[in-house]
Amino acid sequence: MTKNLRLKTGKTIDETYKISFQFNGSTYYGFKGDTLASALLANDVHLVGRSFKYHRPRGIMTAGSEEPNAIVQLHDNTSRTEPNVRATEVEIYERLKASSQNCWPSVNFDIGGINNFFSPLLPAGFYYKTFMWPASFWEKYEYFIRKSAGLGKSPTQPDPDIYEHKYIHCDVLVIGSGISGIMAAKTAAKNGFKTLLVDEKPNLGGSTIYQNSDYFKINNQSSSSWLEKEINEIKKLDNLEIKTRTSVAAYHGYNFLLARENLTDHLPVEQRKGKTRHKLLKIRAKKVISATGSIERPMVFDNNDRPGILLSSAIKKYADFFGVACGEKNILFTNNDSAYETAISLIQKGINIEAIIDNREEVDSKLLYEVEKNNIKIFKGYTVTDTFGYKRINKISIKQLSKDGQNVVGSKINLSCDCLGVSGGWTPAVHLFTQSGGKLKFRDEDQTFIPNTHPSDQLSIGACNGDLTLDEILKSTPNYLKGFLNIKNTEYDGLEIISSTNKSKRNIWLLPSDKVLGKTKSFVDYQNDATAKDIKLALREGFRSIEHVKRYTTTGMGTDQGKLGNMHALGIISETAGAKMGELGTTTFRPPYTPLTFGTIVGRNVGEYFDIFRKTPIHSWHEENKAEFENVGQWKRAWYYPIENENMHQAVQRESKAARESAGILDASTLGKIDIQGTDASEFLNRVYTNAWSKLAIGKCRYGLMLNEDGMVYDDGVTTRLGENHYIMTTTTGGAANVMGKLEDYLQTEWPELEVYLTSVTDHYATISVCGPNSKKIVSKVIPNLDFSDESFPHMSFKNAKIGNINCRVMRISFTGEHSYEINIQANYGKSVWEKCMEAGKNYNITPYGTETMHLLRAEKGFIIVGQDTDATMTPIDLQMDWIVSKKKYDFIGKRSLYRSDTIREDRKQLVGLLTDNPNEVLEEGAQIVADINKSPIEMLGHVTSSYYSPNLNKSIALGVVRGGKNMMGQKLIIPMEKKNINVTVADPVFLDKENKRLNA
């Protein structure tokens, strides 16, 4: 039976609306307005999760988006389930189901908790050190390390919810609805600015809305009462739009911001049907006012992570907002006045406070004196040295601090408690400010970073600007607004203010302990289990940059992005390394500020891409003949043609044998085709390709290689001269659009003097390739009035012809190494001509083949595929294609780069053939190639680019790139795989018919 810690009053909850929900399979009750965190605390549930590395028990620590511990899984169905959700931001609804993450079999008994006992083996960077020996065991270690990675479970079914995007334009965007944000929004709206006010919470007012003691007054009213009236007034303003439950995720340049508006997450699931869940707001504002507030800092001391340890401000909010006591025996631990505000609020509600520990020795504070009137014991100049209790704190130990704060002295005092509130000061929430390009400065007096240089048309006000007390905010905000909005006065000039906060603070980043050095666990990052000891270890091991320490220790790399711990990490680095905090800088604040669902990012752009599928004129024939398809760029290309129960390997073996032994037919319509005309067409090709084109005769074809300006292979294809000033160029399928754009760019910007006209005709023609020993016999039947003799129609030539009354072009070119012809005909006749070829080849067992067989056939011949056997680092020389680079031409694109010292190195990766010792063993494409697996570290020489089993050679073949490969012919190399090492021999990349006898047969 759980306790009920609900108080009689709570500002935001509706006690007439009772809600049942489940957590870890148990049913609890809360009220409308509760968050999951407040409802669990009301039911005396503090243990909600386990930490990432050590699986230590973790409890609710905050009341907002900075929560590092209470990260839960929502829903239990496979489509709507959502991991890593902060319980502090989940508004409960009827039949809500939530569960703890990162624990098994349960949060109360987690087998992973054994990690805590082995923590000496798991320090910062343990994955680089602890499990490195013996090396042969790494694969065993790796399995368990990977298995333990991650927190929650991702959905496995399609998301049933609806998401939208919306564009908003406004004169002034105000981020945050605390007291400064309300003042800014009202002032802007009343001065004629179209204003948008957004806040991540469901209610307006920030923390001031529950600052209701006599020690904080505005115009002789409690600050909360005054603010409530202001909120009621701004809701009536016509040119002010207010959006709650709206979190600004990203702040980009020129005042473009992304915000997520949460519309239905607080509703029961059955009420969400047909409604938009989240809306991604794309906001463009003329001016932006950041009033994002500040985040309370925890304290770093030994065992500061137990369930029941919360931020002092969170305890206050749960009491004031939700009517929840976080414990029955409360202790507060502080270094500033904020904890006394909490104490006064708890006293007013009858909540017991056992003691307050204040590490300041002398405090002159009205708030402290008020607390002392209630006979609450205050330990001045003390610190918490340890806490006790496994699943919930039950006791603390305290000791007096030395004068310099570096040690503890005197006797230990034990105090029992079930809740410890900590307050280590406040950190301005500058995350969005820095995303916008703003620059920070370090303020020594309160050891914090505040905005310094603002981008144009942006202003930071209130606590996020370093004004951390009520009187500072109320005095500075009107002046900032007058300057920023270019107005003469505001209604907030000359407010009467009572603010009793004493700004004195004793900041000690790492509080001392009475334990032996190194035996403590003082947590800096609660979610990732990064401790002060880890940070010091990183410094001892040579890390100095805050970004390096962050990554080595994983500090600030959890779902909370270090909102609580990063300042402490900086402070500990500063003290340990003897560096000034202002000189250390901060880690980079990256969007999103709080996590976004993929649904929010995608919006309505779900299902198939709007990007079209392109189909060849022969596509319907491929479908009728049961072809399997693959996507090549936008094209659907026939991949292979299985017969009966053939798998891909069997089909490809059959197709490739047929193409070599008799005849094969390929739909090559997807190749890019560019019609090139103009008096300077030949000169244009000379500049574009590496080889010479001026003397290419009409009716002849030539293979060309196109480079980038850096000398690296960009594309390839065959270009045919149709007339004196008329060519047709083919490109790779995937590169067609890019090549067309690149050529147009050169014509328009680099060579405008050339008279050349380019037209993309890819879709105009169907291209049918017939190859094999019987190809001539087949095309002779299809085009009987054309002379196909070798004398009349040699390799790399073309002829105009007619099939019936339809004009076509026939090229004798080959991508297989076989005697081959390509028929190019107007697209509408493509399928008809294909069927004629199939009919003509029936007696020769003509076999259609797809892209997979095409790849195998060209690899047997050593022909490259740009993008598979090349990347953006390969030159023609690397590909053993020196022959295609003209030595006579004055210039071509990329020529100068071919002679740089880097590109003429002999040890560059070069294309070679690879033959396995076991001819039946097929290498994996992408596999690394090494010479010596016993050398440490193993030197990677290259990788496999293409690999197949060749039925025509009865062995496996592969192409690869190897450093200095041209000079390694016949040498043995090794392909290290997961379970074995495969021995290979470096060979000529041309595996079949090097003399081209088949091509010219």
Give residue ranges: language-model regions.
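Residues forming the flavin
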Residues: 2-613, 764, 979
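A short, contiguous, amphipathic alpha-helix enriched in charged residues
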Residues: 38-48, 679-696, 781-786
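Acidic, proline/glycine-enriched N-terminal capping motif
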Residues: 568, 575-707, 712
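Conserved, structured C-terminal
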Residues: 615, 619, 623-624, 637, ...
